C-alpha cells in the first residue's frame, strides 16, 4: 500500500516543475531543448536552446555565484555550453514561450532578458560581465484576479508573450527567459527557485539601438536581497508592492522608470 501511494505521488512531483518546450518567434515555431528526449537522439539534435539537465530549478547554492544561473544547470556537470544553432526573428516581433504544463503553485515573477553576443553566440558565454538586459517583466499585479505572474501562466495555456524591441540592431543575441518561484523562500535567505533557459536568436531588421550595460548573471541575484528574492511572498499586497530582481526594463524608449 505504501508503495502504491508513493507511485501515485510521482506525477505530482514531476509536474511541480517545468521548462520552455517550444517558442514562437514571430510566425516561426521552434522546438526548444527537451532534456528527457533529446539527449538520446541519433544523430544528435542541434537546437537553439543551451542544454540543461532537467525540469528542476537552480536553487540557493548555485544561483548566487555559479554559472548555473546564467542558462540553467547544464548536462554532464557543465553549465551554459553554447550551441551552434540560431533562429531568425525580426526586431519588434512577438515571442511566445510555450512552457510544459505549468500547474504548480510557484508564485513569483516572470522575466526575460537579452544579451548581445557581439558576433556569434556559439562563441559567447554570457557568464561574465554586465551583459544581461531585461526587456520584460511581470511580478505581482494587485489589479489582476491572479496577481502573481507565474500563477497566471497556467491560465494562459502555459504560454507567455514578450515583444522584442523594434529598434534593436540586427545581430545574434541570447534570449533568456525565467521564472522565479518564491513559494518556499523566507527572510532568512533560503529556498529560492529559478527556472532560466537561454535561446540563441538572430534578430533581423534595420534598427540601430544597441543594448546598454545590464546586469551580470551570476552576480546580480544576491542572498541579501530581501525585496525581490528572500521574502515572505504572502506579505506582498497592493500596499506592500513587489519588485522583481534584475533591475529595470529596457526597451525602445530606453529604461522604464
Predicted features, each with a name:
Residues 2-110, 117-159, 182-257:
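Peripheral, solvent-exposed domain-edge segments
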Residues 114-116, 166, 179:
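Short, structured patches in soluble enzyme cores that scaffold and shape functional sites
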